[in-house]
A protein has these predicted regions:
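Fe-S-dependent hydro-lyases/dehydratases of central metabolism
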Residues: 1-390
Length: 390
């Protein structure tokens, strides 16, 4: 995984090729292996090697040769596939008690590089200002001593209008990214060479990178824009821009944001950054036809309120285009799974009144959102304990 040679990337783009990967891990999301790879197939490690030798997925490796010897003799999968006895013999030779004892004897000491890491002494972490891997996140910035009430969403603009089965990998990709992306530009501005970009996942400790990567997967489609793929939206001036830049522009104007989706919003792995990034982009609510269970919970944990359409309404049936303003009321006295009124002012001025179901599902989740999220809830409770007071 990672970056390809430029000539390969150029050929894929110019010829509109569907590049393919074969991997033995369980992360076969679009763009996870590389932004230039669309199709990803899962296989056992030996099959990964076999397809690497074949150099193509357009082959029946159970019948066709996968390679040739220097003498031109065809090599078939059966010729290189190990027998059960060979596997058993190798396991017996290498998987030993002594090997585990040796590897785990100093597991908590780390290797030489880990022991050479310089650390500062003190009760709190000394955040390195120049680090592009770890930065102090703004979750507690401006936090008061007491929680507030849940505020209504008033005249929010749509940041993204998405379809069905938007996964957490679409929302917060973990793979590599290019220099043309907002995250890439952020690193270039800090003199990080492209070859050292690494991946979103490796830079999850830097919110500046991760919020720029939210909704930025190159194959995603924001239905606000016709025929455009990637993490783009419309800014306050109505012009196409990155979702990150649009978010920052709206936030500078004090305008709240919403994301609108289809069915099974947030499917896939339980990626915390899919909720963190959404919150940092200034999104106050996500309105969808249905939610994946864990992502719904994570949104609530970050103070972002999930809502579901009711009465058969969808983004399509309502004719939403992304140029609407959205207001949701009744949140200051919200109860778990309560239905609340929503006013949508269409781009042409038409007003539509609909009902949404609030997917804050439990009383404790109401408290989380009142606090601004579960992190604020925990911190305030810790600060209120006798031990903290001492």
């Amino acid at each position: 995984s990672g970056l390809f040679l430029f000539v390969l990337c150029e050929a894929i783009a110019v010829c509109d090729l569907v590049a393919v990967s074969v991997l033995s891990g369980n992360r076969n999301f679009v763009g996870r292996i590389s932004p230039d790879v669309r199709a990803n197939y899962l296989a056992s490690p030996p099959l990964v090697e076999a397809y690497a030798l074949a150099g193509s997925m357009d082959i029946d490796i159970s019948k066709a040769p996968i390679a040739q010897t220097p003498e031109g003799k065809d090599v078939y999968l059966k010729d290189i596939w190990p027998s059960q006895s060979e596997i058993a013999e190798l396991v017996e030779q290498t998987v030993t008690r002594e090997a585990f004892i040796e590897k785990y004897a100093d597991v908590f000491k780390g290797d030489d590089k880990w022991r050479e890491v310089e650390t500062s002494e003190g009760e709190v972490y000394d955040w390195p200002p120049a680090s592009t891997y770890v930065q102090n996140p703004p979750y507690f910035r401006g936090m008061g001593k007491e929680p507030g009430t849940i505020e209504n969403v008033e005249n929010a603009r749509v940041l993204a209008l998405l379809g069905d089965m938007v996964t957490t990998d679409h929302i917060s990709p973990a793979g590599s990214f290019k220099e043309t992306t907002p995250a890439g530009q952020y690193l270039i501005e800090r003199q990080v060479p492209v070859r050292e970009f690494n991946s979103y996942g490796s830079r999850r400790g830097n919110h500046e990178v991760m919020m720029r990567g939210t909704f930025a997967i190159f194959r995603s489609k924001n239905e606000m824009l016709d025929g455009v793929e990637g993490g783009y939206s419309l800014g306050p001036d109505g012009q196409q821009t990155s979702i990150f830049d649009a978010s920052m522009a709206w936030q500078e104007r004090g305008v709240p944001l919403v994301v609108i989706g289809g069915a099974q919003y947030g499917a896939g792995s339980s990626r915390d950054w899919a909720a963190k990034g959404t919150a940092l982009l200034g999104v106050k609510a996500v309105i969808a036809e249905s939610f994946e269970r864990i992502h719904r919970s994570n949104l609530v944990g970050m103070g972002v309120i999930p809502f579901e359409f009711t009465c058969g309404d969808t983004r399509t049936s309502l004719g939403l285009k992304g140029d609407e303003t959205v207001s949701i009321s009744g949140l200051d006295t919200i109860e778990p799974q309560q239905e609340v009124p929503c006013t949508i002012v269409m781009g042409d001025g038409e007003v539509k009144e609909i009902t949404l179901k609030c997917r804050i599902d439990t009383a404790i989740e109401v408290e989380y959102v009142e606090h601004g999220g579960v992190l604020h809830y925990v911190l305030r409770n810790l600060a209120a304990t006798p031990m903290a007071a001492e």
